[in-house]
């Protein structure tokens, strides 16, 4: 069983194992040793979001990587997809992003990317886990790595993201409210939209180390909704702490989630002959309404386990180029190797410009069926193996059979059991979710 790696790298509470300086240094040693392949000069790119603990973890990782003979390029606060892009662009052996995504500042995490810009495979993560508990293979004094900061990384990323749009597409005349969650994109995303001609109202762009995702960003869109309406904006865009996801708000203040965005881009790209794979890849959490909408367009919805890495794996296997999650992760593999909120927003805005219709008309592609998600916290044990819980799940599945879906799973990042049900009958959906949640609480 893995001790450190979860569904999205290594994550935890700062200064508690595994998110300590000591563990971070050993991660640098282990990952560095694993990727010391060939006789070229080895290099790792390290970026971070704006959490206070990022400084501590960055220095620990630098010490670990250089101690085994790897050079380090430090790029400072940058979106997660920027690290993936820079890793490929700089021909680095490895990329590291220090972030806990949408979590509060007390948490932090370490995400690793291979030289191809994709998140590491299960096999690579397992190999690094093994090396973490072994005696590190340190370089001799003449082969210790060097660390260097570069100042133009932000400009490289901004240029690459803008290149995803055709040269003739401009955002002139659009007023956009952009919420950067006081996170990694605070100094890149506003520039992207401004350089393309938009009138940008930026919020969440004053990070202080402890205000990342604090009442702002994609998981707390109330401020964005209020600002869009108050400023008379055409659209609002909220990124999360590491800018790999987005949530959109139309000019009336209504929220558009990842399902609606996937539906719009998938259907539009299909009409343009740009869609690959004959459909869209999403997770088991995406709304049944999206599936029905795509079927009506002659497209299919491929479902995976929760997590953008599972979405990307299926996209690569099936030759798809559009995938994502209801939470706002958008993977557009013609342009990026991982989810990129800024890039996805540009593709969405290109559709808005071309349609010449209000966001409230264009972005509501379908009516979602009633869906309810509740979380039950547990301290330990295996509540999903409890007989009463299993009986409640079976009863819920029988009740929704043919009229909805039921998904019960443990969170990959927190001690939670997530219970989701959806169907045409909102009352029945709520009854099923509450019944299963009660059974889980009784079991723990």
UniProtKB/Swiss-Prot annotation:
Modifications the protein undergoes after translation, according to the UniProt entry = Activated by phosphorylation.
A GO cellular component annotation here is:
cytosol
Active site, renumbered: 101
Instruction: Note whether Ribosomal protein occurs among the keywords.
Output: no
Task: State how the cofactor is bound.
Answer: Binds 1 Mg(2+) ion per subunit.
| EC class | isomerase
**What cofactor is needed?**
Mg(2+)
Q: Which GO terms describe its molecular function?
A: magnesium ion binding; phosphoglucosamine mutase activity; phosphomannomutase activity
What EC identifiers does the entry list? 5.4.2.10
* Keyword Metal-binding assigned: yes
List of residues that carry Phosphoserine: 101
What does the entry give for GO biological process? Answer: carbohydrate metabolic process; peptidoglycan biosynthetic process; UDP-N-acetylglucosamine biosynthetic process
Q: Which reaction does it catalyse?
A: alpha-D-glucosamine 1-phosphate = D-glucosamine 6-phosphate
Pfam families per record: PGM_PMM_I, PGM_PMM_II, PGM_PMM_III, PGM_PMM_IV
What UniProt keywords apply to this chain's record, in alphabetical order? Answer: Isomerase, Magnesium, Metal-binding, Phosphoprotein
Where, by residue number, does Mg(2+) bind? Answer: 101, 240, 242, 244
Q: What does this protein do?
A: Catalyzes the conversion of glucosamine-6-phosphate to glucosamine-1-phosphate.
PANTHER family in the record, alphabetically? PHOSPHOGLUCOMUTASE (ALPHA-D-GLUCOSE-1,6-BISPHOSPHATE-DEPENDENT), PHOSPHOHEXOSE MUTASE
Instruction: Give the similarity note.
Output: Belongs to the phosphohexose mutase family.
What name appears for this protein in its UniProt entry? Answer: Phosphoglucosamine mutase
């Amino acid at each position: 069983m893995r001790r450190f790696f979860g569904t999205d790298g290594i994550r935890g509470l700062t200064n508690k194992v595994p998110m300590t300086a000591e563990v971070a240094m050993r991660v640098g040693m282990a990952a560095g040793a694993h990727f010391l392949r060939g006789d070229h000069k080895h290099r790792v790119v390290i970026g971070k979001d704006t959490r206070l603990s990022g400084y501590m973890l960055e220095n620990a990782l630098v010490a670990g990587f250089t101690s085994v003979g790897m050079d380090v390029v430090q790029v400072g606060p940058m979106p997660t997809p920027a690290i993936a892009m820079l890793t490929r662009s700089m021909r680095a052996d490895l990329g590291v992003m220090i972030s806990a995504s949408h979590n509060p500042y007390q948490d932090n995490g370490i995400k690793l990317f291979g030289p191809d810009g994709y998140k590491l495979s299960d096999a690579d993560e397992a190999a690094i886990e093994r090396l973490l508990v072994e005696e590190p293979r340190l370089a001799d004094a003449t082969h210790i790595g060097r660390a260097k900061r570069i100042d133009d990384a932000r400009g490289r990323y901004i240029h690459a993201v803008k290149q995803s749009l055709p040269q003739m597409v401009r955002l002139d005349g659009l007023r956009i409210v952009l919420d950067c969650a006081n996170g990694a994109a605070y100094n890149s995303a506003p520039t992207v939209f401004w350089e393309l001609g938009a009138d940008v109202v930026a919020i969440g762009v004053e990070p202080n180390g402890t205000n990342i995702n604090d009442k702002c960003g994609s998981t707390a869109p109330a401020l964005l909704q209020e600002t869009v309406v108050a400023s008379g904006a055409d659209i609002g865009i909220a990124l999360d702490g590491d800018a790999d996801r987005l949530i959109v708000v139309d000019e009336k203040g209504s929220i558009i989630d990842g399902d609606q965005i996937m539906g719009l881009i998938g259907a539009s790209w299909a009409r343009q002959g740009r869609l690959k794979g004959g459909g869209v890849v999403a997770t088991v959490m995406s709304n049944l309404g999206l599936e029905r909408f795509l079927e009506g367009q002659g497209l299919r919805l491929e479902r995976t386990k929760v997590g953008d890495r599972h979405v990307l794996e299926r996209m690569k296997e099936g030759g798809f180029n559009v995938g994502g999650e209801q939470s706002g992760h958008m993977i557009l593999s013609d342009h990026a190797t991982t989810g990129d909120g800024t890039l996805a927003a540009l593709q969405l805005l290109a559709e808005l410009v071309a349609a010449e219709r209000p966001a409230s008309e264009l972005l509501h592609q379908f009516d979602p069926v009633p869906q309810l998600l509740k979380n039950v916290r547990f301290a330990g044990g295996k509540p999903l193996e409890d007989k009463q819980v299993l009986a409640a799940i079976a009863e819920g599945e029988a009740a929704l059979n043919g009229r909805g879906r039921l998904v019960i799973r443990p969170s990959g990042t927190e001690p939670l059991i997530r219970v989701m049900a959806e169907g045409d009958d909102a009352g029945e959906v709520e009854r099923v979710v509450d019944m299963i949640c009660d059974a889980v609480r009784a079991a723990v």
